[in-house]
């Protein structure tokens, strides 16, 4: 089935018809600190996209950048270089800081089951290509040099700001609410290369035709895209906060470099909201993955919470909401574990074969419904609701329920099979002689239709913390 996504660029849904080589780029973290769970909501959304594409049969080439040079809060150069600031505070080099937090980021991604990119593009390793991009733009008269910095002249790019809904007439009004760099020709112009920064002790600088300096964030992403994907990109991912400045600047750089339209589909995820504001380090209202673990939550509890809301809707975070997600996830695993424990060896063997070889039409109906939901703008929250429908269905056997759960988990990624197997291993117990006598007495009682005695024995086991599960192969004893 073809995937449809809401395209920020067209304000409409776009179909991805090319299955053979889908090029996807995501704006990655600035590695000056631990990423917080607000950041990870966006990366979980990106993970759902990549896994859905592959689930549907697309061949995907997925790249993500790592901003290790620093990240100014604005083009005015009045924001602190975050990587350099952290390095000074900790008495380390910027390279040591960026390496540490890059590794920490991907460790947290692994805990959240966020897919590792096919290519990780580290900004500081691509400086020569960034310089070449500026040279070409300079030759084409899209740049100017002012006060030691190279600027992009947005007045030369007629469609500047279209994705963000900034009209040519309204551009000055849109940017009049912020302090403007007095060395700009136009309020929307932005720096490509800094040589005259107010941060004189910046460690990361490189020689260039315009002087010793460093690139802007917008140039980094644009140049690395051009270097890795050449002139074609199918999907660009990011958060909604990237729309109004970063992504429209990136479009301006690349399209002026290529002399053609670039990247048909831009997809943006909404904020995680805490205390009525977006979660951010600047607001001081952020929580890390480690912070969740310290409060006895699994990172997958947070992933479950993210699955309950569509990526284009803001998601309210609270510990009550997270606790509800934890309970729901554990309840799901417990129910599926019960189904698994009830299976005989022949049924268990079926779960190790091709899961999509459906033996019953109702299995195929549920599968098709799941595919339909995730194919339309990644409606994974409806897919999660469908999984609960499967679990509670009276028309599906245990094998069918487990098959569908394992298939759906290829996208929702809650480690369902692993959690069930772990629970099964932990719950298996050694049956002593007294237990064997009682189990045999119960078997005879059931054969003689003495269900009262059979239930009494079952209740006796329950009080001791055991669950009796009747199967074709006999009664299994599990810990409750």
UniProtKB/Swiss-Prot annotation:
Cofactor note: Binds 1 zinc ion per subunit.
InterPro entries: Cys-tRNA-ligase, Cys-tRNA/MSH_ligase, Rossmann-like_a/b/a_fold, tRNA-synt_1_cat_dom, tRNAsynth_Ia_anticodon-bd
Summary of subunit composition and partner proteins: Monomer.
Pfam families with a match to the protein in the record: tRNA-synt_1e
Keywords of this entry: Aminoacyl-tRNA synthetase, ATP-binding, Cytoplasm, Ligase, Metal-binding, Nucleotide-binding, Protein biosynthesis, Zinc
Catalytic activity: tRNA(Cys) + L-cysteine + ATP = L-cysteinyl-tRNA(Cys) + AMP + diphosphate
Gene3D superfamilies per record: Cysteine-tRNA ligase, C-terminal anti-codon recognition domain, HUPs
Listed EC numbers: 6.1.1.16
Entry binding sites for Zn(2+): 27, 221, 246, 250
Localization of this protein: Cytoplasm
Source organism phylogeny: Bacteria, Pseudomonadati, Spirochaetota, Spirochaetia, Spirochaetales
Reported cofactor(s): Zn(2+)
Listed HAMAP family: Cys_tRNA_synth (MF_00041)
Binding-site list for ATP: 281
Protein name: Cysteine--tRNA ligase
Any one GO MF annotation of this record: zinc ion binding
Segments carrying motif 'KMSKS' region: 278-282
Gene Ontology CC, one term: cytosol
Family, per entry: Belongs to the class-I aminoacyl-tRNA synthetase family.
GO-annotated biological processes: cysteinyl-tRNA aminoacylation
Top EC class for this record: ligase
Taxonomy, superkingdom: Bacteria
